[in-house]
Amino acid sequence: MYGIEYTTVLTFLISVILLNYVLKSLTRIMDFIIYRFLLIIVILSPFLNAPNYGINLPITGSMDTPCTNSTREEVFLTSTLCWYYPTEAATEINDNSWHGTLSQLFLTKGWPTGSIYFKAYTNIASFSVDPQLYCDYNLVLMKYDATLQLDMSELADLLLNEWLCNPMDITLYYYQQTDEANKWISMGSSCTIKVCPLNTQTLGIGCLTTDTNTFEEVATAEKLVITDVVDGANHKLNVTTNTCTIRNCKKLGPRENVAVIQVGGSDILDITADPTTAPQTERMMRVNWKKWWQVFYTIVDYVNQIVQAMSKRSRSLNSAAFTNRI
């Protein structure tokens, strides 16, 4: 009996000793692996040059949230700048080498000559149909015209903000806008927009759903239309679809790599959607000069201050992708 108990105790002690030995062996092996891994990291770290993403960046909200950039003063060496101007500027200057002249002047401000791109547009109406902004920073010059003030404001609203858009089938469905950020954006050679608000029984309010002549006309033969109606109410729409495309869009936030520079005019463009708030003028500037050379000289002189108010995080704008995100 005592022999069996002694054997059991001895077996238990041997098991404990073996287990302790195994654990110590595993610990030494793991320490060896970890130390070798750390040694490899220390040796290779001077040869690795990878950016550190996401440590202090917000993971919610707009990706356009401005973040501190420790290399901001060197941004011009690795960035592109697009300059959009009306063709009348080139006509007035009448100099085939004026692009090269401005590129050399930009060089004095720290911008390499190969990073500046000049793009002309005929007029506000034509630019509204097919705006394309591809550079890291985009400066859009608009000469003030009192007869086109509203068109300029709509174009500025389109350019200075990001929009998430989806197609609208106005022949089959009614549509409503859910909040102030929800707008209907139309583009085309000629956009005429008519709307008929509906009650809860889908009957027209002040109009007949079967007679488009009774609809309220909110835009007539325009190139770009941003339509805002009463939120929460269904609407039946009538659009010149053969010459115009309409999309249901949601304003996501600012497109911070775009700035609009108004040339001349006594009034400052305002793209504020809500009439009860202060005017929205972020990245909207004005230059008051009569001659285009003077306008260009002024902008070159202040280009670095203008860019400091911008961010190159935003997506590019291509109206060809209008069905998804602009």
Curated annotation (Swiss-Prot):
Compartments reported by the entry: Virion; Host endoplasmic reticulum lumen
Protein name: Outer capsid glycoprotein VP7
Signal peptide location: 1-50
Taxonomic placement: Viruses, Riboviria, Orthornavirae, Duplornaviricota, Resentoviricetes
Similarity field: Belongs to the rotavirus VP7 family.
Role this protein plays: Calcium-binding protein that interacts with rotavirus cell receptors once the initial attachment by VP4 has been achieved. Rotavirus attachment and entry into the host cell probably involves multiple sequential contacts between the outer capsid proteins VP4 and VP7, and the cell receptors. Following entry into the host cell, low intracellular or intravesicular Ca(2+) concentration probably causes the calcium-stabilized VP7 trimers to dissociate from the virion. This step is probably necessary for the membrane-disrupting entry step and the release of VP4, which is locked onto the virion by VP7.
Subunit annotation: Homotrimer; disulfide-linked. 2 Ca(2+) ions bound at each subunit interface in the trimer hold the trimer together. Interacts with the intermediate capsid protein VP6. Interacts with the outer capsid protein VP5*.
Residues bearing carbohydrate: 69, 238
Protein residues bound to Ca(2+) 2: 177, 228-229, 231, 301
Highest taxon, organism lineage: Viruses
A molecular function GO annotation: metal ion binding
Chief localization: virion
Region (GPR motif): 253-255
Entry-linked Pfam families: VP7
Residues that hold Ca(2+) 1 according to the record: 95, 206, 214, 216
Additional facts recorded: Some rotavirus strains are neuraminidase-sensitive and require sialic acid to attach to the cell surface. Some rotavirus strains are integrin-dependent. Some rotavirus strains depend on ganglioside for their entry into the host cell. Hsp70 also seems to be involved in the entry of some strains.
Residue ranges of the region described as CNP motif: 165-167
Organism: Rotavirus A (strain RVA/Human/Japan/MO/1982/G3P1A[8]) (RV-A)
Processing and modification events after translation: N-glycosylated.
InterPro entries assigned to the protein according to its UniProt record, in alphabetical order: VP7, VP7_1, VP7_2
Cellular component per GO, a single term: T=13 icosahedral viral capsid
Annotated keywords: Calcium, Capsid protein, Disulfide bond, Glycoprotein, Host endoplasmic reticulum, Host-virus interaction, Metal-binding, Outer capsid protein, Signal, T=13 icosahedral capsid protein, Virion
Disulfide bonding pattern of the chain: 82-135, 165-249, 191-244, 196-207
